[in-house]
């Protein structure tokens, strides 16, 4: 029951509770720290992505810098009075040109008093978030408390009583105290919130899919917060969205938004319901951008759950990211969190090109500068453009994988091409009017709109893109320092199978010489006979998928091309191509999405997915000795009773037959399992989730 009636209209939250409700990846700048303000990102924040065009239209011909260096004057942690959604008001003051040389330490906002600098908390407060099930959100029902939350966050329960029961008091984001009855009962026994929970659900208008957050502050006070699930205009649930930007032609839609849901969103005005949308008006963006460009102080409202990237970014992060000379082929990793912010997962990707996301409306802006491709495209198929400071560079060039036929004592080097000396010819164009500096600016990077690099056979990859070889001969004069020029006049390269990129150069251009890293002994002798064009790699003949297919029975591939169908319908073909010297090279051709089918996991590992999530949690099956240990781990991980898992655990074998785990030895199950998905049962068994293990052969 509610014990506090009226609350003051503007009330600052406890920063610890605010951060727990905002999510683990949210980091607020500290007062007096230096940040960059991106009006382009602010416009996305106001309209879920389509606001950039509207902001540019309202600003008209006025010159607007792509980013403005500011000092944080203050931060207020607040919550919406109606929805309990947390947000912050950040007061910013543009840094005058004369102050740009003065450096101050940039720190993240400590969990102290709102708006003031404070000593960092000695330890992170304990919190727990759970996505509400249909049973939890039922009117008149109770809340099933995961054991971890009950034992570490709630007050200690006296298990000697029969039944163990206590009253729990929790304060929400508005300072209102709620009273719940906590009892440990049932068969099997579990922790429940009964009396008072139904009132809380009705008052907060909670539905299945929303998340509840419990936090124990460093002072021992129990707090409760809410993370509402995103909803479509039609009332349905929306997947985790983080990158909606329909105003940018190719620049990032929802991070985990499937094609069908994307179409549904477009059918309802291109946005649906999104947290933060409607709270930040476009007029506020225009006003803030105008004040920032004129050097006057201004204030912005920031909604951490609005599913758009931060538009107030720590200055040191931006400067460090833009000192990197970004170019296609670089490998990186990027963090994403689940909808309920319970897990943060890192995903690997490759930069495909470097270009301004919207050169017409926001020229010279580093916002969403990197176009990327992902190792797991089925999960991140719509995240196409990201900002450099959001990724962590793993390798500046694609890795070199030496096959077993290569001698470990030999040094791998790219032979010089007569028409393209490699040293001293790489250009570093920069942005015009770059506020971060002149020609030695950290905003230097390589322009590239071509696909990333030569991806050879899986046994041998090296990171010098073929288009770089051809730059000197074809279009070296098209690039010059000081701009990002799109190479529209260049014939786009043709992609051969997955990972092979061969430029559409004239026939007399010796492509095989550019791809050949070999010794004279293994080089093939040319003759007057008509030969099939091929690629030479380490002195071995690499045949394309089209050549293998067209060769049929006339050209021998030992032992031939075999097709293995993966569970997701993608074929994986392998073939052995003879090089004429008695040895052969095994080449793997995989269609788009094959790498995602095995999830890039090591042997004995698999990923576990909740039905409502698109980001999995990796577990190591090799540490378990039996199904019982696995059941216990899943029960602790998802807050599901162990008995329910035992009764409803099924898996599908390679033939597609659904079986009970008891029919297969655990050792076989451990070797084959790659993906486990926890799905809800039908309406009659809504409280007894069905766990389906989708098994794929490695």
Swiss-Prot record:
Expressed in roots, culms, leaves and young panicles. GO terms for biological process: auxin-activated signaling pathway; regulation of DNA-templated transcription. Homodimers and heterodimers. GO terms for cellular component: nucleus. Residues 549-577 have a biased composition (Polar residues). InterPro entries: ARF_dom (IPR010525), ARF_plant (IPR044835), B3_DNA-bd (IPR003340), DNA-bd_pseudobarrel_sf (IPR015300), PB1-like (IPR053793). Residues 603-683 form the PB1 domain. It is found in: Nucleus. The keyword Signal does not apply. Keywords: Auxin signaling pathway, DNA-binding, Nucleus, Transcription, Transcription regulation. GO terms for molecular function: DNA binding. This is Auxin response factor 22. Residues 549-579 are annotated as: Disordered. The keyword Disulfide bond does not apply. Belongs to the ARF family. Interactions between auxin response factors (ARFs) and Aux/IAA proteins occur through their C-terminal dimerization domains III and IV. Auxin response factors (ARFs) are transcriptional factors that bind specifically to the DNA sequence 5'-TGTCTC-3' found in the auxin-responsive promoter elements (AuxREs). Residues 128-230 bind DNA.
């Amino acid at each position: 029951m509610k014990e506090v009636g009226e609350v003051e209209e503007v009330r600052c939250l406890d920063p610890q509770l605010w951060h727990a409700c905002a999510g683990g990846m949210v980091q607020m700048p500290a007062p007096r720290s230096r940040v960059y303000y991106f009006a382009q990102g602010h416009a996305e924040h106001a309209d879920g992505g389509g606001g950039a065009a509207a902001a540019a239209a309202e600003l008209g011909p006025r010159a607007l810098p792509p980013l403005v260096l500011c000092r944080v004057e203050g931060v207020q942690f607040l919550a919406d009075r109606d929805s309990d959604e947390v947000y912050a008001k950040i007061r910013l003051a543009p840094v005058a040109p004369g102050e740009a040389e003065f450096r101050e330490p940039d720190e993240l906002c400590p969990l102290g008093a709102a708006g003031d600098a404070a000593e960092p908390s000695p330890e992170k407060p304990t919190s727990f978030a759970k996505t509400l099930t249909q049973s939890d959100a039922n009117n008149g029902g109770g809340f099933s408390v995961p054991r971890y939350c009950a034992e570490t966050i709630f007050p200690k329960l006296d298990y000697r009583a029969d039944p163990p029961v206590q009253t729990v008091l929790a304060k929400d984001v508005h300072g209102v105290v709620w009273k719940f009855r906590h009892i440990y009962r049932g068969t099997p026994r579990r922790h429940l919130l009964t009396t008072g929970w139904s009132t809380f659900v009705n008052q907060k208008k909670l539905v299945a899919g929303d998340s509840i957050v419990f936090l124990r502050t460093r002072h021992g006070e129990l707090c409760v917060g809410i993370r509402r699930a995103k909803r479509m205009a039609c009332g349905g649930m929306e997947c985790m969205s983080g990158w909606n930007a329909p105003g940018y032609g190719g620049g990032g839609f929802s991070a985990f938004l499937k094609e069908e849901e994307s179409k549904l969103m477009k059918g309802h005005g291109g946005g649906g319901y999104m947290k933060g949308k409607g709270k930040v008006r476009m007029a506020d963006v225009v006003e803030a951008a105008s004040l920032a460009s004129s050097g006057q102080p201004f204030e912005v409202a920031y909604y951490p759950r609005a599913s758009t990237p931060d538009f107030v970014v720590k200055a040191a992060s931006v400067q460090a990211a833009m000192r990197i000379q970004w170019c296609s082929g670089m490998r990186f990793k990027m963090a994403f969190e689940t909808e309920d912010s319970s897990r943060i997962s890192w995903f690997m990707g490759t930069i495909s090109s470097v270009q301004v996301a919207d050169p017409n409306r926001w020229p010279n802006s580093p916002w969403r500068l990197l176009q990327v491709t992902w190792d797991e495209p089925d999960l991140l198929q719509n995240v196409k453009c990201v900002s450099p400071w959001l990724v962590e560079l793993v390798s500046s060039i694609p890795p070199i994988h030496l096959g077993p036929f290569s001698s470990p004592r030999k040094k791998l080097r790219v032979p010089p091409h007569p028409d393209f000396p490699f040293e001293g010819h790489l250009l570093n164009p920069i942005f015009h009017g770059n506020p971060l500096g002149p020609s030695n600016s950290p905003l230097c990077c390589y322009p590239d709109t071509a696909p990333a690099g030569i991806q050879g056979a899986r046994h041998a990859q090296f990171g010098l893109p073929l288009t770089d070889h051809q730059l000197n001969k074809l279009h070296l004069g098209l690039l010059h320092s000081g701009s990002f020029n799109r190479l529209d006049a260049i014939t786009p390269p043709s992609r051969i199978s997955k990972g092979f990129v061969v430029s559409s150069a004239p026939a007399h251009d010796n492509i095989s010489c550019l791809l050949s890293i070999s010794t004279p002994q293994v080089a093939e002798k040319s003759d007057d006979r008509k030969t099939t064009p091929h690629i030479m790699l380490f002195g071995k003949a690499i045949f394309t998928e089209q050549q293998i297919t067209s060769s049929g029975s006339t050209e021998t591939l030992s032992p031939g091309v075999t097709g293995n169908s993966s569970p997701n319908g993608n074929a994986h073909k392998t073939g052995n191509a003879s090089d004429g010297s008695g040895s052969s090279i095994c080449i793997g051709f995989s269609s788009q999405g094959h790498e995602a089918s095995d999830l890039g996991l090591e042997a004995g590992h698999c990923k576990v997915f909740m039905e409502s999530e698109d980001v999995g949690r990796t577990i190591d099956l090799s540490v378990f000795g039996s199904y019982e240990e696995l059941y216990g781990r899943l029960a602790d991980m998802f807050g599901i009773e162990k008995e329910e898992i035992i009764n409803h655990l099924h898996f599908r074998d390679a033939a597609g037959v659904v079986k009970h785990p008891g029919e297969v030895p655990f050792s076989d199950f451990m070797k084959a399992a790659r993906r486990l998905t926890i799905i809800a049962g039908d309406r009659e068994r809504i409280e007894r989730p069905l766990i389906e293990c989708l098994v794929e052969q490695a």
